[in-house]
Amino acid sequence: GTIKELLAAYPGQLRVVFRHFPLDQACNPLLKRPVHENACAAARAAVCAAGRGQFWALAEKLFAGNTDPEDLLAARRELHLDDAEQTACAARPATAAVVAADIAACSQAGITAVPVFLINGRPLRGARPLAEFRRLIDQELQLAR
């Protein structure tokens, strides 16, 4: 997707930090109504996949809309992630704490919806064309020179 394309276009110039902000009341107390059921489980699964170097691979599958339990299990298996290990990891309080800390960081940054991309602190809200990302990145790179 967009992040892969940007990393390829700007080798060694970008640092990507992902913060979880699941739109699911099961773990996100900032939501007033349900939006994406199973998003909290998906966020915990992504944290666990990161521990095996598979964060982006799993995230790509999850962002394609595959967050129900059966699809999540199939995605983990497709990536050769051990079911028992991943299930145990997702159930750990430390894993939930990672997601909770990300939600808190997003809240402090004023983020209330996703996706939001911060480029040197400048927000780009919602799905945007690649050209818009490039324009903002190029501006920031010029300022850094």
Where are these regions (language model features)?
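C-terminal cap of thioredoxin/glutaredoxin-like
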Residues: 1-10, 14, 65, 70-145
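Structural alpha/beta surface segment adjacent to cysteine/selenocysteine redox centers
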Residues: 1-77, 143
